[in-house]
């Protein structure tokens, strides 16, 4: 079912499609590999195009799979060159998360070589309150060796367990690489399960 195509870009919620159906949103700070992850998951070379300068993709990009299922590529930030725009992007994201009823799954990408960013932690807590399933992809896992990947995954899982032990929410953490394709199959399986539809054809 991974027949996906670009629909529109929006810098406010009023320009988004009607708030119905199901939306899977991808979020990651600048240079987290978010666009490459979307391309890899949906087997498209350039369905999601990353900006040449990190943090310059300031719009919500919407991709459609059918009339009721959309993929949302959210803007990321984190670089000083766009500090004046940070507040505008943050308000846009806050409005989307708090008011978008069709948002059903949040996928957060975090460079495996870094720690969880403060903003991403806030996103996770927000997702708890909204009861949205969260999938954390520790991206660029090909950049470190197997032992370091294993250790980092364990650290993230312990953090999640500590944070979510009293919360009733689905949350998963995987290592991921669009280069080595680490985690792609598991990600597809999880999304098939959480959406309760055959989003991806699995061999």
From Swiss-Prot:
The keyword tRNA processing does not apply. CDD domains: YihA_EngB. One of its GO terms (molecular function) is GTP binding. Its cofactor is Mg(2+). Gene3D superfamilies: P-loop containing nucleotide triphosphate hydrolases (3.40.50.300). GO terms for cellular component: cytosol. Mg(2+) binds at residues 35, 57. GO terms for biological process: division septum assembly. Transmembrane segments: none annotated. Residues 20-197 form the EngB-type G domain. Keywords: Cell cycle, Cell division, GTP-binding, Magnesium, Metal-binding, Nucleotide-binding, Septation. Pfam families: MMR_HSR1. It comes from the Bacteria. InterPro entries: G_ENGB_dom (IPR030393), GTP-bd (IPR006073), GTP-bd_ribosome_bio_YsxC (IPR019987), P-loop_NTPase (IPR027417). HAMAP family: GTPase_EngB. Necessary for normal cell division and for the maintenance of normal septation. Belongs to the TRAFAC class TrmE-Era-EngA-EngB-Septin-like GTPase superfamily. EngB GTPase family. This is Probable GTP-binding protein EngB. It comes from Wigglesworthia glossinidia brevipalpis. The lineage of its organism: Bacteria, Pseudomonadati, Pseudomonadota, Gammaproteobacteria, Enterobacterales.
């Amino acid at each position: 079912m991974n027949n996906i195509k670009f629909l529109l870009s929006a810098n406010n919620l009023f320009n988004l499609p009607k708030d119905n159906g199901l939306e899977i949103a991808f979020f990651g700070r600048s240079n987290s590999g978010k666009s490459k992850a979307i391309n890899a998951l949906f087997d498209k070379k350039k369905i999601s195009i990353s900006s040449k300068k990190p943090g310059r993709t300031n719009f919500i990009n919407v991709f459609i799979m059918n009339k009721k299922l959309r993929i949302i590529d959210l803007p990321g930030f984190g670089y000083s060159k766009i500090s004046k725009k940070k507040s505008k992007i943050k308000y846009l994201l806050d409005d989307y998360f708090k008011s978008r009823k069709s948002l059903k799954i949040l996928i957060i990408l975090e460079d495996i070589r870094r720690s969880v960013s403060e903003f991403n932690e806030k996103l996770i807590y927000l997702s708890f309150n909204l009861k949205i399933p969260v999938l954390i992809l520790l991206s660029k896992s090909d950049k470190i060796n197997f032992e370091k990947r294993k250790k980092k995954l364990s650290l993230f899982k312990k953090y999640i367990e500590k944070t979510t032990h009293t919360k009733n929410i689905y949350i998963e953490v995987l290592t991921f690489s669009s280069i080595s394709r680490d985690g792609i199959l598991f990600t597809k399986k999880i999304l098939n399960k959480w959406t309760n539809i055959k989003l991806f054809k699995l061999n």
